[in-house]
Amino acid sequence: MKKILLSAVLVISLFAQEKNFVEIGAGFINSKDNFSTNELSNISSLASASDENEGVALVDFYYGYQTSDATTVYASMFLGELSLGTNFMTDIGSFDVGITTGLGGKEWQNPFLTNTNRAKTDVSEIGAHVDYGFSLAKAHNVQLIYSYSVKSYDTETVQDSLKRDGSRHIIALENSYTPEFGKGQFTYLFNTSLENYDAKGDASTYDAIMFEFGITADITKNVNLTAIAGLGSKEYDQSNPVFGKTVETDISSLVGVLKWERPFEYKNFYSTLKVGYEEEDANVEFYDKENTFTLLSLGYRF
């Protein structure tokens, strides 16, 4: 399944504290993305992408095994990304170290070709992460995350300055604050992330920044709603030789998660509805992107 939204991953990370669960679901994605292989293989111009619809299946899980009072080893999968790691508690906070890999995907060997069939190529990405969690106050929690990954394309036929093989660095800071006056019924969220993608080609190398604000609140005893809005930007390092300018992009997103605990009084079960929208508005039409997704799933804790 294609990567949907960074926001969605951050929202789902809120529920990763619920150890040992499996969640199965399905949904759809409506998107506009010239770099997606769901788009037409033969395009006549380098203009905005057309709409595409895709049905998706969802299998998320987390399984942790406590090797000591302070250490847990785990395996997890969220939105098609498989992680293996270790979490351990110390006097100064919690640490999480692990490796992450996607299930593989496909992209165009050369997405900029027109009036000819574009060929697909296999793409893989594998990386590692280090997380540090701590608290500055009783009502405040912080998660500092650094992740590094390497992305590889089997075959690329673009110009050298557009080569996309590269390494990705992400630094993220996730904050949550649960005020005492709310009696624990709602929590404010503030997330910041910085991304550097260092590609072989300077015209495919970029820096991105994202700010996200949100709230999670108990609607009823068994129903919780989380909403996160994001704003950000992305800027490439060098002028794109196909378009004769450096690509710059404004990013906006909105993600909502509605969670229903013990539906119809079934113990250990829960149901989740995830909806989201993201837009990348670039100064080059070909780089414009839109994604809208809806996912409905049923989970079980064990």
Tell me the role of every PLM-derived stretch:
Residues 29-33, 70, 80-82, 104-108, ...:
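Sequence/structural signature of outer-membrane beta-barrel proteins
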Residues 65-67, 88-92, 132-136, 175-181, ...:
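Residue-level signature of outer-membrane beta-barrel architecture
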Residues 46-49, 113-120, 125-127, 154-166, ...:
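Extracellular loop and loop/strand-boundary signature of outer-membrane beta-barrel proteins
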Residues 69-73, 92-97, 136-144, 180-188, ...:
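Repeated loop/turn-to-beta-strand initiation elements of outer-membrane beta-barrel proteins
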Residues 21-27, 62, 74-78, 98-102, ...:
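Transmembrane beta-strands of outer-membrane beta-barrel proteins
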Residues 53-59, 80-84, 122-128, 165-171, ...:
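Residues that define the transmembrane beta-barrel architecture of outer-membrane proteins
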Residues 17-70:
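Outer-membrane beta-barrel initiation region
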Residues 61, 260-262, 274, 289-302:
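Outer-membrane beta-barrel "beta-signal"
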